[in-house]
Amino acid sequence: MSAVPFSKISTPLNALFATIGLLVVAALTTQGLTGQERLVFELLLAAIWLAYVLQLSGTLLSRRRRLSGEMTALVIDLLAVLVPAAAFLFVGSRDRDLYCAIWLLKPLRDSTFFRLLAKVVANESRNLLGVTSVFGIVLFGAALAGYIIERDVQPDKFGSIPQAMWWAVVTLSTTGYGDEIPQSLAGRVLAGLVMMSGIGIFALWAGILATGFYEEVRRQDFVRNWQLVAAVPLFQKLGSAALIEIVRALRPRIVPAGAVICRKGEVGDQMFFIVEGRVTVATPDHPVELGAGNFFGEMALISGDPRSATVSAATEVSLLSLYAVDFQILSSSSPEIAETIRKTALERRGGPPKE
């Protein structure tokens, strides 16, 4: 079997291999395993390692494609193979299996999450730094107050600010006491205030990151939809302001090959623009194929007529759908867009465009 197909091991399969491997690593640390059981586990680890070797080979053989987009996958594939191999050669038999824990990274090789996380952190760095500064101030203030209040009561635990700082860290980051508990009333009041401050600070961090993720995902969706809309010939002559209105109204949709998009006789509530792929229109005479740049289902928006034909996906097709409600909003806010769609639809049907 060629090594190249192994470069296409899916993310779920990578996760499955990694999960099995890590469970085996955990099992090998238990006491009382027989020699036969240990051998079976070792062979299972070797089989997963060989699968990763084939995946790495496939990745290296397909380097003709863009290098930057696959660099993360290549690095993870290399680590998944080289780290266990180096451990087998240079580490004692007791601990060498533990190095297979590097397979924790395998499910992330095709993930875009860390790129998204890096963008969010970069965008929100000023706010995150501000909250971190507040955390540091509260941390030192809590340690100082704990030292002053508890140093005579518990000198072994609060005898210095560095000692009290451990209590402050634990109290700020958890709800409840850690291994050090204030004994005085003032110390307990301080602990309650520190715990509430910690809840507020971590809520600020979480809120900033959640808002940043939402804004970044929305921005990426807007850029992707803009590119899809700009690829439709019907909209290529429109200005930026009009395109923005369309991007807000159109909704992307992926339809698998063979799926029915709309059926003859149905009451339609949307029209479709083909961005990529082909669809088959079942006309009375013979089927007609439409490709990228074409649209269909427009009469449902213009005249409200039922669907005149059944349309199905000849291949996997990327569509942009415009609902009747959004079409009415576009007609009010940007009449030129609605008029362009209306004229083009009537011309396709052989009728004169309405002036």
UniProtKB/Swiss-Prot annotation:
One of its GO terms (molecular function) is cAMP binding. A motif (Selectivity filter) lies at residues 174-179. It is found in: Cell membrane. CDD domains: CAP_ED. SUPFAM superfamilies: cAMP-binding domain-like, Voltage-gated potassium channels. Gene3D superfamilies: 1.10.287.70, 1.20.5.110, Jelly Rolls (2.60.120.10), Voltage-gated potassium channels (1.20.120.540). It comes from the Bacteria. The chain crosses the membrane at residues 13-30, 39-61, 74-93, 94-111, 129-149, 185-209. It is a multi-pass membrane protein. The keyword Chloroplast does not apply. Disulfide bonds: none annotated. SMART domains: cNMP. Pfam families: cNMP_binding, Ion_trans_2. GO terms for cellular component: plasma membrane. 3',5'-cyclic AMP binds at G297, E298, R307, S308, R348. Keywords: cAMP, cAMP-binding, Cell membrane, Ion channel, Ion transport, Ligand-gated ion channel, Membrane, Nucleotide-binding, Potassium, Potassium channel, Potassium transport, Transmembrane, Transmembrane helix, Transport. Residues 31-38, 150-160, 180-184 are periplasmic. Residues 161-179 dip into the membrane without crossing it. Residues 1-12, 62-73, 112-128, 210-355 are cytoplasmic. Cyclic nucleotide-regulated potassium channel activated by cAMP. Belongs to the potassium channel family. Homotetramer. This is Cyclic nucleotide-gated potassium channel RHE_CH03180. It comes from Rhizobium etli (strain ATCC 51251 / DSM 11541 / JCM 21823 / NBRC 15573 / CFN 42). The lineage of its organism: Bacteria, Pseudomonadati, Pseudomonadota, Alphaproteobacteria, Hyphomicrobiales.
